[in-house]
Amino acid sequence: MKIGFLGFGKSNRSLLKYLLNHQEAKFFVSEAKTLDGETKKFLEEHSVEYEEGGHTEKLLDCDVVYVSPGIKPDTSMIELLSSRGVKLSTELQFFLDNVDPKKVVGITGTDGKSTATALMYHVLSGRGFKTFLGGNFGTPAVEALEGEYDYYVLEMSSFQLFWSERPYLSNFLVLNISEDHLDWHSSFKEYVDSKLKPAFLQTEGDLFVYNKHIERLRNLEGVRSRKIPFWTDENFATEKELIVRGKKYTLPGNYPYQMRENILAVSVLYMEMFNELESFLELLRDFKPLPHRMEYLGQIDGRHFYNDSKATSTHAVLGALSNFDKVVLIMCGIGKKENYSLFVEKASPKLKHLIMFGEISKELAPFVGKIPHSIVENMEEAFEKAMEVSEKGDVILLSPGGASFDMYENYAKRGEHFREIFKRHGGDEV
C-alpha cells in the first residue's frame, strides 16, 4: 500500500509519524513549499519519498492521499486525483475512524470555537475526566491515539470537515455560522454544509447542540440525533444570568457577548451530558479566556484598549462592537469576500472612528460613507491615529475582520504587536 500526503503541515506531519510506527506501507510527501532541513532529514531517515516546490503526478500512484486542511478544493492536483479515483481523506477522519465516537466532543462555528473548545476541556478535566484537547486547536487529533482518554475535545474547522469523508461523532456543538472563508469555499452554502456535516451523520442516540439561528441557513429535519438549540426561551444568556432548561443561574463574572455565547453553548452541552450545572458554574470561575479574544489590555490617558486580534470575520467584529456604545475601531488584514455594505450598515451606530490598514482597507473603503475614518500604513500608525481621534473614556478596539497573513505570521503575532505598542506608550496593564 502507498499512502500520500498532499501538503505537509502540522496535521499531516503528526499523521505520518503515527503511521510510521503503526502501519506497514510506503509513504510519499508532496509539499508546494520548500521543506526545511530538519524535515528533510526526518523523511530521509525514515525512507519516506518526498517532493517539494510543487505537486506532481507521482501522487497518482498512491492508494489514499491525506489532504492538508488548508488546500483549496479547486487546486489542480485535487481535481486530477479526483478524476483518477484516488481516495482523499484527512488526519481528522483517520482519528475518528480509530476512536470510540461516544468519547468525542466536536466543536465548530465561525467565531468562538477555540474558546468554547478550551472551556469544554476545562470543565471536563475539572470534573475528573482524563481529557484530550486538540484538533484545529493546538495538537492534531491523531496524537491522542498514542494514549487513553475519557474524552477527546476537538475544535473542527470547515476545511477539516470539508475534506473528511465521514466525520461521525456522538457529541457535536455548533456555536454559530456566518459568512467566512468565502475565499476558500466556492459558496456560502458549501461552507454551511461543511460545518454541519457531522450533524447529518449522527444517529438517534447522539447529541447535537446548536445555535437556533442556524435553522435559517439549513433545514435540520434530516438530523436524526437529539437536537438541542440554544438562544431559545429555554436556553439563553443575559449579561448577568444563564438560563438552561428554563432555569436561571447567576453568572460568576462579567463577560463580553461572544464569551457569553460560548458559556451558554457549552453549558447546554454539559447539562445534556451530566444533567446538572452547579459544577460547571463552579469550574467556570477558574477559566481564563484565551488571549487575543476581547482581551482587555488596560488604559492610556483614560482610554480603554482591547485586543481582539482573533476576530478574522466581520461577524466577529460585530460581536465585539456589541459590547460597547461608541468605539474607535482598528481593522486590518485580508478580507474574506464578505458583504461589507451590510457590515458597515450594522456597525456604523457603534463607530466613533474607523481606522483601516492592509488589504481589507481597499475592500471596506468604498462602503464607509460618512463614517469618520482613516486609512494608514501599519499598526504603529493605526495606534497613533487612535490616540489622536479618541479622548478620555473612549474604547480603542483592535478587531481586524480579516486574516493576518498580509503583514503577520498569524493572528497571535498581530495581537502581540498591538500589545507591545500599548506597553511602549505607557499602557497601564490590568
From Swiss-Prot:
**SUPFAM superfamilies per record:** MurCD N-terminal domain (SSF51984), MurD-like peptide ligases, catalytic domain (SSF53623), MurD-like peptide ligases, peptide-binding domain (SSF53244)
The highest taxon in the source lineage is Bacteria
In the record, what terms sit under GO molecular function? ATP binding; UDP-N-acetylmuramoylalanine-D-glutamate ligase activity
* Enzyme kind, highest EC tier: ligase
Instruction: Report which reactions are catalysed by this protein.
Output: UDP-N-acetyl-alpha-D-muramoyl-L-alanine + D-glutamate + ATP = UDP-N-acetyl-alpha-D-muramoyl-L-alanyl-D-glutamate + ADP + phosphate + H(+)
Classify the main location.
Answer: cytoplasm
Gene Ontology BP term (one): peptidoglycan biosynthetic process
Q: Where does this one sit in the cell? A: Cytoplasm
UniProt cross-references to Gene3D superfamilies, sorted A to Z: Mur ligase, C-terminal domain, Mur-like, catalytic domain, NAD(P)-binding Rossmann-like Domain
Which EC number(s) does the record attach to this protein?
A: 6.3.2.9
In this record, what's one Pfam family?
A: MurD-like_N
One annotated Gene Ontology cellular component of this protein: cytoplasm
Where does this protein act, in terms of pathway?
A: Cell wall biogenesis; peptidoglycan biosynthesis
UniProt entry keywords in alphabetical sequence: ATP-binding, Cell cycle, Cell division, Cell shape, Cell wall biogenesis/degradation, Cytoplasm, Ligase, Nucleotide-binding, Peptidoglycan synthesis
Provide the residue positions that the database annotates as binding ATP: G109, T110, D111, G112, K113, S114, T115
HAMAP family associated with the record:
MurD
Function summary = Cell wall formation. Catalyzes the addition of glutamate to the nucleotide precursor UDP-N-acetylmuramoyl-L-alanine (UMA).
- What family does the entry list? Belongs to the MurCDEF family.
Name this polypeptide is given: UDP-N-acetylmuramoylalanine--D-glutamate ligase
Organism whose genome encodes this protein: Thermotoga maritima (strain ATCC 43589 / DSM 3109 / JCM 10099 / NBRC 100826 / MSB8)
